[in-house]
């Protein structure tokens, strides 16, 4: 009984002391600031949960619909629906259309559709060849295939038939039924409130260090995101989940930049605007596959020029010679080359069977690795190599070959590290940062980042209130720790979960991809997002060696921000949901067609 009495007495004393504590807080020099931060930290979490979970759940619930585009009649009895724009015809089980006849080669030919609905057949050097309406088709040459034409594959006759009007109606209905698009307006309002409250919090946290660049930058990103959504809604687009996630992460980027480098925040906003511009341009360009493939040689040339400029004129920073100074700007060309690497590495179905195409990409990859080795950029080289493995596997499907390449590269990497003292020092300190000989030396950054992460707790100290922001590279390499300290573990985890969701959605989009080009591009961009996030987060926590890799959309840095928006364009191009992506032309989705047709 005495124990219960003491407990209730303690509770009464606690609540009785609250008014006095609040009064003392308001009387203190920063009374309003302390009260605002105390409440704002919880409101930030609620807003972040609403913004991100609303978009995340929409992406995870949505299905990229699988549609029937035509039928291929094989022999007298078999009728196969064509559910992709690119199909391999052959005897092998892995073919999109399997023809069980010994006169048909394992991979006999390809049947592809373009934006205008025209189907084309290309023979892949099959043993018994192919003919169209009695005319022999030359190996590796394309011919147009019309409805009712007789296509002979070996001794098997095939005929292409269009879908009926009723089936076309059903396609449109099913697409609309499978598409779950949430209204962007509540999320935009919540994100706007988040941005306004962040500005107030930065005023409180930074004090005299606060400047008008911060106000202008947050006003700019607010206007930018509203303008983007309004313009796209005017174009009859309704799916904005990916962009809202990216705008939220970009808002955090402005916040961490303002916290660490208040005088650089406007420059960071400009790169966000440039990134959105690049995203819009790439999505518009990628919607036309032939046009996308035609400029591959131009993209190759630009990538080579960027690498050569970096090798010749680059200057060393943090152990890597991967920066170029142009006036007052410092850029990292390798971030932009990631986009080129995916652009030229992705391939349409016809290109997958061209040895010349594969050889050129392999030579370019070796050239890229060589340049990155000269620049001593271990983190970027690792990302490029993982992307190369992903692209190579998706292009060939040969897992054994990929394992051999990875094994040889791992051995070569270990040998190379022996000659790179800076990189080797990071490897040696890995897992031992708390040892006396490392804690204030090569382990300095990681021990401080882990300490700051722990001090943030679940809700954080408040933007501009942390101490890690004063440490070197806190806004780039250690940004996960900075976000955890100032914004809390909950928002930091949501930040990671947002990247994971983009990747999961890209993976689910593969099944309904219009072309292998978009599938390979989306998977490659997904792998870069995932691997960069993993290296940044785990490097900060000493689970992986610290590589200096940025967190997508969040880390400060112009080229990193621009490249992140560019990578998002590859994911957006794989989104075939009804009205969701302007990377897909309206006529390909049944938009504008009345249900009665």
Q: Can you annotate each of these PLM segments?
A:
Residues 2-102, 114-115, 164-174:
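Intrinsically disordered, low-complexity acidic Ser/Thr-rich regulatory segments
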Residues 509-548, 554:
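Loop-to-helix entry and N-terminal half of a specific, functionally important transmembrane alpha helix
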Residues 25-30, 131-181:
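C-terminal boundary/linker segments immediately following FHA domains
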Residues 355-374, 378-418:
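Hydrophobic alpha-helical segments of polytopic membrane proteins
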Residues 173-318, 562-576, 580-589:
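A structural signal for hydrophobic alpha-helical transmembrane segments in multi-pass membrane proteins
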Residues 317, 321-323, 327-330, 403-495, ...:
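Hydrophobic, glycine- and aromatic-enriched re-entrant/interface helices and adjoining loop segments
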Residues 534-597:
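A juxtamembrane structural motif centered on a specific transmembrane helix
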Residues 80-156:
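Forkhead-associated
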């Amino acid at each position: 009984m005495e124990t219960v009495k003491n407990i209730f007495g303690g509770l009464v004393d606690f609540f009785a002391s609250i008014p006095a504590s609040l009064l003392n807080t308001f009387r203190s020099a920063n009374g309003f600031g302390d009260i605002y931060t105390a409440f704002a930290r919880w409101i930030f979490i609620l807003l972040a949960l609403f913004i991100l979970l609303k978009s995340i759940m929409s992406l995870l619930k949505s299905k990229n619909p699988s549609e029937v585009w035509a039928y291929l009649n094989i022999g007298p009895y078999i009728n196969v629906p064509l559910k992709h724009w690119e199909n391999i015809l052959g005897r092998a089980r892995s073919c999109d259309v399997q023809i069980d006849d010994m006169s048909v080669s394992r991979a006999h030919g390809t049947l592809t559709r373009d934006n205008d609905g025209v189907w084309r057949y290309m023979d892949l050097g099959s043993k018994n060849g192919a003919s169209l309406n009695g005319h022999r088709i030359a190996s590796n040459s394309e011919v147009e295939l019309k409805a009712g034409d007789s296509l002979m594959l070996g001794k098997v006759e095939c005929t292409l038939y269009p879908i009926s009007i009723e089936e076309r109606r059903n396609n449109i209905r099913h697409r609309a039924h499978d598409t779950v698009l949430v209204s962007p307006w509540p999320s935009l309002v919540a994100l706007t409130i988040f941005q306004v409250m962040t500005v107030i919090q930065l005023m409180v946290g930074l004090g005299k260090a606060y400047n008008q660049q911060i106000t202008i930058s947050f006003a700019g990103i607010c206007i930018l995101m509203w303008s983007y959504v309004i313009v796209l809604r005017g174009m009859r687009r309704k799916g904005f989940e990916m962009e809202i996630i990216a705008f939220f992460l970009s808002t955090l980027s402005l916040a961490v930049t303002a916290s660490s480098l208040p005088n650089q925040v406007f420059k960071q906003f400009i790169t966000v605007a440039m990134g959105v511009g690049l995203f819009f341009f790439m999505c518009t360009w990628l919607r036309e596959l032939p046009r996308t493939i035609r400029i591959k040689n131009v993209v190759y040339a630009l990538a080579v020029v960027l690498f050569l400029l970096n090798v010749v004129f680059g200057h060393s920073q943090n152990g890597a010679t991967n920066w170029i100074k142009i006036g007052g700007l410092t850029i990292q060309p390798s971030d932009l080359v990631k986009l080129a690497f995916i652009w030229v590495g992705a391939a349409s179905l016809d290109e997958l069977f061209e040895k010349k195409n594969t050889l050129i990409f392999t030579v370019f990859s070796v050239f890229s690795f060589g340049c990155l080795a000269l620049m001593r950029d271990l983190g970027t080289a690792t990302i490029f190599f993982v992307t190369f493995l992903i692209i190579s596997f998706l292009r060939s499907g040969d897992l054994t070959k990929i394992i051999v390449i990875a094994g040889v590269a791992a051995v070569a990497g270990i040998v190379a590290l022996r000659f790179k003292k800076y990189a080797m020092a990071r490897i040696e300190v890995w897992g031992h940062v708390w040892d006396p000989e490392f804690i204030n030396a090569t382990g300095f950054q990681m021990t401080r980042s882990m300490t700051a992460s722990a001090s943030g707790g679940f809700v954080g100290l408040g933007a501009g209130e942390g101490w890690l922001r004063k440490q070197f590279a806190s806004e780039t390499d250690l940004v996960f720790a900075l976000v955890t300290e100032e914004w809390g573990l909950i928002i930091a985890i949501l930040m990671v979960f947002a990247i994971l969701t983009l990747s999961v959605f890209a993976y689910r989009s593969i099944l309904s991809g219009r072309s292998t080009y978009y599938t390979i591009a989306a998977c490659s961009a997904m792998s870069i997002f995932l691997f960069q996030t993993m290296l940044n987060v785990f490097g900060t926590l000493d689970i992986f060696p610290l590589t200096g890799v940025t967190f997508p959309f969040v880390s400060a840095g112009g080229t990193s921000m621009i490249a992140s928006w560019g990578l998002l364009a590859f994911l957006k191009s794989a989104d075939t949901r009804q009205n969701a992506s302007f990377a897909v032309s309206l006529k390909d989705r049944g938009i504008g067609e009345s249900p009665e047709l």
